[in-house]
């Protein structure tokens, strides 16, 4: 017999305005509010600091938005960017850079403790001095959102608000190289037409050896639009590339290959390839990886998540051989091309799924490993390492991470208090934070591990 059910009405959460004192910051630089009301909810609110008394509005079970600072912290400063209160890009400008660095190191330490990488009651971590960046104008690549306002016949270009699809229109960005937004502003009159703007998803501006603007196109552009873009490109000497769902093409065969210098070598790339946003700090990070790994001409190196050869090329110049392993086939090919362009014949490039890599994918055991994964981390590589026979394991590893939670998870596999010491006996010998993303909560970390004797 058929049965009919009437869906129950959902209880709508009622937004409330409350007052509380901030107890701490979490690893995303959100203020932690504890013990609110009879249910003792914990809430997370962006923009406040430990010790501050704030007024905020509840927006969900564990979230809220900051309305007023009633009792400010002595660590608070006025944000230097005029768009800070609206833009969702930077989220940590309300404290000095020294505070940002201290907080980030504390986050790494707390996550290592949580995941069992070390026990703060019985040992300390071998922290080295952080690699410090210029606090502003450090980005050589920015991605901007776009939206065509049909009624106003106007194109919005800017960054999205925090946790929102709304766009904050900007004419400058304090953390970006000045040339990037200047190029976008000059191109704006050409983009601000319905024939282009209605087919524009987002745009990216990059500047290494020369500027380039990448337009993400959702549909084919008409002939007159392509002609207008081509004329602008020729007049301003700024290359334009068009990216559709399955294709990346230069407009009118624009320009020579783009390159960035690292350790005296040139790395060629295409717009759309992964490129560290902070060129200055990247050079220092690569040099520190070389110093920590200390490769010799008799040693083999594995470079996992190799990209276009950021670490592989400098390491190949100092070692017997390098196997560069990269998940994206196009970039794996580019790494090999970059090695050849720099006169290196001791680098092999392999495109492989790094989440499911096995010993059969690797040929000769390597003495040194370098890892630079994206935010999901390198769990597959760490699991492989744990399974290898002792004679197949590297003597030294440098792990570069942009996500401290997955870093802690991965290190716990091979170096944690609960790891199988018979199969994976590594200890942390050096670590530091890398100031890749000043004015934001994002944390870059470098860790050096060595096999215990």
Report residues per predicted region.
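Residue-level recognition of conserved beta-strand edge/terminus positions
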Residues: 57-59, 145, 450
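Structural signature of eukaryotic scaffold interfaces centered on beta-propeller domains
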Residues: 206-207
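Terminal RNA-binding accessory module
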Residues: 1-83, 349
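Extended interfacial segments that mediate partner engagement and assembly in macromolecular machines
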Residues: 67-78, 86-200
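Rossmann-like S-adenosyl-L-methionine
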Residues: 2-19, 24-28, 220-453
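Short, solvent-exposed loop/turn segments that connect beta-strands within catalytic domains
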Residues: 38-39, 149-155, 393, 420-424
């Amino acid at each position: 017999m058929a049965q009919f059910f009437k869906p129950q009405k959902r209880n709508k959460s009622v937004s409330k305005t409350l007052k509380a004192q901030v107890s701490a910051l979490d690893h995303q630089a959100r203020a932690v509010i504890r013990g609110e009301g009879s249910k003792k909810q914990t809430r997370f609110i962006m923009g406040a600091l430990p010790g501050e008394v704030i007024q905020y509005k509840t927006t969900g079970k564990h979230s809220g938005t900051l309305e007023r600072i009633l009792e400010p912290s002595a660590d608070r400063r006025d944000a230097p960017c005029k768009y800070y209160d609206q833009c969702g890009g930077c989220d940590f400008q309300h404290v000095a850079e020294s505070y940002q660095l201290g907080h980030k190191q504390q986050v790494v330490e707390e996550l290592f403790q949580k995941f069992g990488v070390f026990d703060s009651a019985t040992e300390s971590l071998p922290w080295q001095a952080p690699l410090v960046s210029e606090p502003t104008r450090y980005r050589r690549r920015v991605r901007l959102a776009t939206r065509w306002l049909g009624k106003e016949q106007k194109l919005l270009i800017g960054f999205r608000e925090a946790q929102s699809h709304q766009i904050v229109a900007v004419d400058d960005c304090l953390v970006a190289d000045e040339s990037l937004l200047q190029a976008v502003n000059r191109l704006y009159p050409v983009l601000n037409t319905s024939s282009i703007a209605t087919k524009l998803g987002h745009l990216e501006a990059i500047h290494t050896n020369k500027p380039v603007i990448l337009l993400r196109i959702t549909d084919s552009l008409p002939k007159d639009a392509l002609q207008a873009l081509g004329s602008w490109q020729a007049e301003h000497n700024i290359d334009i590339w068009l990216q559709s769902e399955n294709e990346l093409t230069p407009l009118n065969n624009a320009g020579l290959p783009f390159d960035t210098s690292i350790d005296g070598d040139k790395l060629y790339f295409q717009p759309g390839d992964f490129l560290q946003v902070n060129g200055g700090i990247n050079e220092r990070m690569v040099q520190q990886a070389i110093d920590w790994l200390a490769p010799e001409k008799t040693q083999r190196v594995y470079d996992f998540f190799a990209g276009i050869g950021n670490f592989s090329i400098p390491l190949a110049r100092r070692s017997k051989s390098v196997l560069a392993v990269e998940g994206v086939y196009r970039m794996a090919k580019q790494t090999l091309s970059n090695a050849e362009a720099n006169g290196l014949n001791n680098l092999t490039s392999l495109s492989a799924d790094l989440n499911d890599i096995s010993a059969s994918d690797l040929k000769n055991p390597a003495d040194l490993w370098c890892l630079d994964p994206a935010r999901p981390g390198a769990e597959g590589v760490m699991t492989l390492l744990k399974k290898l026979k002792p004679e197949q394991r590297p003597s030294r590893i440098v792990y570069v991470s942009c996500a401290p939670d997955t870093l802690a998870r991965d290190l716990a596999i091979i170096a944690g208090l609960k790891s199988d010491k018979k199969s994976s006996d590594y200890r942390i010998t050096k670590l530091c934070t890398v100031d890749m993303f000043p004015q934001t909560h994002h944390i870059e970390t470098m860790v050096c591990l060595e096999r215990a004797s």
